[in-house]
Amino acid sequence: MITPQQAIERLISNNELFYDEMTDLMRQIMRGQVLPEQIAAILTGLRIKVETVSEITAAAAVMREFATKVPLENAEGLVDIVGTGGDGAKTFNISTTSMFVAAAAGAKVAKHGGRSVSSSSGAADVVEQMGANLNLTPEQVAQSIRQTGIGFMFAPNHHSAMRHVAPVRRSLGFRSIFNILGPLTNPAGAPNQLLGVFHTDLCGILSRVLQQLGSKHVLVVCGEGGLDEITLTGKTRVAELKDGKISEYDIRPEDFGIETRRNLDEIKVANTQESLLKMNEVLEGREGAARDIVLLNTAAALYAGNVAASLSDGISAAREAIDSGRAKSKKEEFVGFQPQQRCHFLGKMELG
């Protein structure tokens, strides 16, 4: 067992923590057994030293261990569409829009997200703005996935142990290991993922982490300029985990017959209301940059979720899902989802 003080000493000496040590330390943090000042020192030490694949893997495994899970009989076909945030791009909610298009094209989407930290609109903000219920129980999220093909998991509802860390993170004011742990800890256990990151170095790192955590088919992407999505403005770095192996390559919009844009101004928004408006325009079939970036990211989600055989096939499926009106209908179905209620008779008989 490693004590918090021993961990701090190791980190300030620029030495990494071994997997078992990081596991033990993270469990202590999640149980509330580490002082806030010590957590701050640990997060600072990890950031300065730079977190290793082993340290991130251990921390993510413990967060999964402590998470309130979504009870699904079979999570094999699930895909998560998520980003680390932190890119400062102020774009509309691309991955959330892609969630509806992907589900309309046949994917089972288990999306994990929270409120805005650095963006104009977080995934949870826009889901709430459209009228959906953020506070479903884990059982109700599972119902939603079975019934609509989409489950949205509001991160604070599934990671209550993070209450021991949240005040420290806010007070530090810089990115820490926890900024990349959230997307690695899907409570529904989705084995397939489109994961956007804010730096190209993280593509290789997080693909290796997810490999060690047992993920099946993952695309970790970083758009030119640090966008945590597949971008329209140039190349996107991709690290793909498939069949246990990792390959890295670059893609560009023109590879798929999509116009490269000079900038992202057309898809920037100031707040959640503007983001929802942009989302609705895409789902209603309006042409433009917003539609194009959703096509690219939906294609990657469909490919990661093994619904499409390739990114090119994914583009075609995404386009058809929008143009047929099915993507718009899928959003309405998700927002209108009403969980089945169990009936209790005299506190003894349960029907349902």
UniProtKB/Swiss-Prot annotation:
GO terms for biological process: L-tryptophan biosynthetic process. GO terms for cellular component: cytosol. Pathway: Amino-acid biosynthesis; L-tryptophan biosynthesis; L-tryptophan from chorismate: step 2/5. It catalyses: N-(5-phospho-beta-D-ribosyl)anthranilate + diphosphate = 5-phospho-alpha-D-ribose 1-diphosphate + anthranilate. It holds the Pfam family Glycos_trans_3N. Anthranilate 2 binds at residue 169. Binds 2 magnesium ions per monomer. Anthranilate 1 binds at residue 83. NCBIfam families: trpD (TIGR01245). Catalyzes the transfer of the phosphoribosyl group of 5-phosphorylribose-1-pyrophosphate (PRPP) to anthranilate to yield N-(5'-phosphoribosyl)-anthranilate (PRA). Homodimer. This is Anthranilate phosphoribosyltransferase. It comes from Neisseria meningitidis serogroup B (strain ATCC BAA-335 / MC58).
